[in-house]
Amino acid sequence: MKTAMLIAVLGFCAALCFVESSHEEEREAAVYLTDLVSKAESAIKRGIPCRCDKNSDELNGEQSYMNGNCGDGWKKCRSVNAIFNCCQRV
């Protein structure tokens, strides 16, 4: 949850920087920050490897960032925290 909140705050800051920038160099920095935020968001949504079994070191699932829904073709194997689930392909 901390990661998602941080990304949301960074996204807001990037948008604010872009709107408030008066120099080309500031605009370039805002565009760069916006690009980093979008890449971070897609990395979270795409899935980070996770363990379905707490007692195993095998990364046999992917984290899902869809409020408890793993999506079509996936099944939930473990809750990681309040936002993320560890999901496996069916």
UniProtKB/Swiss-Prot annotation:
The UniProt keyword set, sorted, is: Cleavage on pair of basic residues, Disulfide bond, Ion channel impairing toxin, Myotoxin, Nematocyst, Neurotoxin, Potassium channel impairing toxin, Secreted, Signal, Toxin, Voltage-gated potassium channel impairing toxin, Voltage-gated sodium channel impairing toxin
Q: Where in the cell is it found?
A: Secreted; Nematocyst
Q: Which family does it belong to?
A: Belongs to the sea anemone sodium channel inhibitory toxin family.
Q: Does the keyword Membrane apply?
A: no
Propeptide residues per the UniProt entry: 22-44
Disulfide bridge positions per record: 50-86, 52-77, 70-87
- Originating organism: Exaiptasia diaphana
Major subcellular location class = secreted
Task: Please state what the protein is called.
Answer: Delta-aiptatoxin-Adi1a
GO terms, molecular function: potassium channel regulator activity; sodium channel regulator activity; toxin activity
**Anything else the record notes?**
Negative results: has no hemolytic activity on human erythrocytes. Has no effect on the shape, color and configuration of cardiomyocytes. Does not show significant effect on the calcium currents.
GO CC aspect terms: extracellular region; nematocyst
Free-text function comment from the UniProt entry = Cardioactive peptide that acts on voltage-gated sodium channels (hNav1.5/SCN5A) and voltage-gated potassium channels (Kv). The activity on sodium channels consists of inhibition on sodium current inactivation with no significant effect on current activation. This effect may be caused by direct interaction of the toxin with sodium channel site-3. The activity on potassium channels consists of a significant increase of the amplitude of the transient component of the potassium current, shifting the current threshold to more negative membrane potentials.
Annotated signal sequence is 1-21
**Which InterPro entries does the record cross-reference, listed alphabetically?**
Myo_ane_neurotoxin_sf
Q: Does the keyword Signal apply?
A: yes
